[in-house]
A protein has these predicted regions:
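...captures the hydrophobic TM-helix bundle architecture rather than a specific catalytic motif
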Residues: 1-203
Length: 203
């Protein structure tokens, strides 16, 4: 009986564990998403201002020999929209402990994200201008190149969360990592919508 009392005293004397920090990864992803949105938004604003100045001077924005293809931009937009749907499916499946569908959704999301990159590369090839040829080409390459880099980061984020889900670390309401990856991906898709409209549609 004395031993039992001593054990109770020993265990009750231990310090309480540190409280868990809720949603740290989600908040970090939100801050990172906001930062990249400001950077890319600034570049698009500079692009729009330069375009307005050139057109106001009576010149064409796209110089002779340059072509901005609608096909590549539109395909890129459609591909990313589909990937946003599959990312939402990934998060939904994890929250409902539907692991087979979560793995399928993660794989499809990564596949669609990778498929977006060749559409941008094709647009660069069809542009007919090098990055150093004109200020217009430099801005187009800078904006679209930065967005491809963001997609690469988003794909890496999704891949890491997919492997964590495969290892059983993301389950039910504890799937904060999947929510964080999805948030970053949604912002990336929304940013491409801005880029697509400013460069491909408005030209």
């Amino acid at each position: 009986m004395a031993a039992t009392s001593a054990e109770i005293e020993i265990f009750t004397g231990l310090p309480a564990p540190a409280p868990p920090r809720p949603r740290v990864l989600l908040v970090g992803a939100a801050l990172a998403s906001g930062s990249v949105a400001m950077v890319l938004g600034t570049l698009v604003a500079i692009y729009a201002r330069l375009r307005s100045d050139v057109i106001a001077g009576g010149d064409a924005w796209v110089p002779e020999g340059g072509v901005i293809q609608l096909t590549s931009g539109n395909m890129g937009m459609v591909t990313l929209i589909m990937s946003a749907v599959t990312v939402a499916w990934f998060v939904y499946s994890l929250r409902n402990d539907d692991r087979p569908h979560a793995y399928l959704a993660a794989g499809l999301s990564i596949l669609l994200g990778v498929a977006y990159i060749p559409t941008v590369v094709y647009g660069w090839q069809q542009l007919g201008l090098g990055a150093a040829d004109t200020p217009q080409a430099l801005m187009i390459f800078a904006i679209t190149g930065l967005h491809v880099a963001l997609v690469g980061v988003g794909l890496l984020f999704l891949a890491v969360m997919g492997f964590r889900a495969l290892g059983g670390q993301l389950t039910g309401r504890a799937a904060e990592g999947a929510n964080a990856a999805a948030l970053f991906w949604y912002v990336t898709v929304a940013l491409y919508a801005v880029v697509w409209y400013a460069i491909t549609i408005v030209k």
